[in-house]
Structures are given as C-alpha cells and as structure tokens.
Amino acid sequence: GFNFLDVGGENYDKNMSGRFYELADEMRLVHEHLPRAFLAAVLFLPLPASRDKGKRSSFAHMVVELRERTNPADPSLPRVPGKCDMGWVALYAEGDEPEGFPRGVVRFFNAARDCPRSGRPKVLETESLSEMAAAIVEAARRQIKPNYVAS
C-alpha cells in the first residue's frame, strides 16, 4: 500500500484507515483459503512522512497501527485471520529531501520495533530489500516449522 500527502498538504496518514481495512480484507481472504500462509504487509511512505507532524509523525503512526494489525511472532499463539504475520513500513526518497538522498532510495522498517515519534529512523535500524526479504523468509520458516506435519 502507498499513502500520499493529503489535499491540505499537512500529513501522509489521511486515508490510513482505508488502507488498513483493505489490508484486513486481503489477509482474511487469503487465510480463509490458505490457512497456513505466511503474509507480510509492506506499506510505503515518502521520507517526509517521518517529520510531517510535531508530536507523532505519519511514519510513527503507520508503524504503531501496522504493529496492532500483525499477529504475534510466537508460533504457539493463535493467529488472527484478518492480521498479517509480519509488517514493514518502507520509507522512500523522492529526491528533494534536505538530507540529499537520491530519488528512489528505499529502506524498510520492521513494524515490530519501536520507532522515533518524529524524525526518520537511523539507517542501522532499517533494512535493505534483500535484508527484509531474508527476515520474512526466516520468520515464515519459524512460523511454519512447528506446525508442519509430514504425511
């Protein structure tokens, strides 16, 4: 999912509720047909979303909301069909940020972690695409392995 600057130009979380309703519907539908499927959600925000508001940025709001819609990592706990198994918020550079990042640079933040209330996370607190993919695969292996029964 993507979120853009609202019409008033103040923040990036204007239609966040709609994105999460869509996410829950997708998760529920897939889990209904494939109950053991491991589903990861990735929501994209431009880098200015990390500093668009004073108290809590749109990025921080997105991380907290996505965390609440993610199943616990413990495979012994029951999974909720309308939740994803892992959530990530991607921050991407549009190319005109004061930090000077080139257009298209993307870093992925695991929603299970705490993030700054305002401002971007440190690069070391984020993952590249390949690091995120490896983390998703590893989490899926941990989730599926205890429940796998060979026939």
Locate each region found by the language model.
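Conserved catalytic cores of phosphodiester-cleaving nucleases, focusing on short active-site segments
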Residues: 1-6, 23
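Short acidic/His/Gly/Ser-rich catalytic and metal-binding motifs that mark active-site loops
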Residues: 6-9, 99-101
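C-terminal tail/extension regions appended to the core domain(s) of diverse proteins
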Residues: 51, 59-151
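Acidic, metal/cofactor-coordinating or nucleic-acid-engaging core segments within structured domains
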Residues: 9-92
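Generic low-polarity alpha-helical segments
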Residues: 1-2, 39, 129, 144
